[in-house]
Amino acid sequence: LEYLAEQADEAGMNGHDAEEHADRTHEKQQEIHDRIVQYYRDIYDTSVQKAELATTVAENEHRLVKGIDLDNDYCLYVGIPFCPSRCLYCSFTSYPIGIYAEKAKTYIDTLCKELAYVAEQYNHKRLVAIYIGGGTPTSISHELLAVLLKQIQTVFRLQEPEVADGLVEFTVEAGRPDSITPEKLAVMKEYGVTRISINPQTMNDETLRTIGRAHNAAQVKEAFA
């Protein structure tokens, strides 16, 4: 409403005209919302509740990202292809860290070189988000995690206020609670991570065992605590 009021002021509208403008805008937004919900129902046979939820989430996301300049802004994704164990349902490129631990250092060293190259190639654009996924990034040691995050901080100049202020998200996936340690949390805090993602998949211990997750529901609660 504040945004619409500013638009009205710029257009020289009086209070009545501005109110009518806001009403028309709201009606148009609701019309688009309803059309999208109906599309979900007609094409994908989605329930009303799920169609409404998906559309509302998309609208909220749009409000968050509409300020991003797609020509001059960019987001960085960093993949860490290691996990504590491989889940039975997983289709991602991922390797059990227990077997491939000796490869992790080589991977991180090589990744750091690639990050330096990417930073150089995109130094004319604005970095707005960093997402470190996998795999399970927190399956590597806290020492290697520190090497990675320090490199990101250095080559992308995250300590510079103008860069840090433009960063809307710095996420590290910590999808497996059995991979989270106080040392790793301290490293993430030190290097400016603003969000971690802990994904239990299920809180049913029997299901966790069946799908190959080497942790239980109690560990999930402990990780959040």
Name what the model sees in each region:
Residues 3-76:
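N-terminal [4Fe-4S]-dependent radical SAM core
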Residues 30, 81, 214-218:
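Short, amphipathic alpha-helical segments
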Residues 73-75, 87, 169:
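Structural motif
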Residues 77-79, 133-134:
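Residues at the beta-strand->loop junction immediately N-terminal to the Walker
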Residues 79-94:
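Local cysteine-cluster metal-coordination motifs and their immediate loop/turn environment
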Residues 94-225:
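Conserved non-cysteine loop/helix-boundary elements of the Radical SAM core domain that shape
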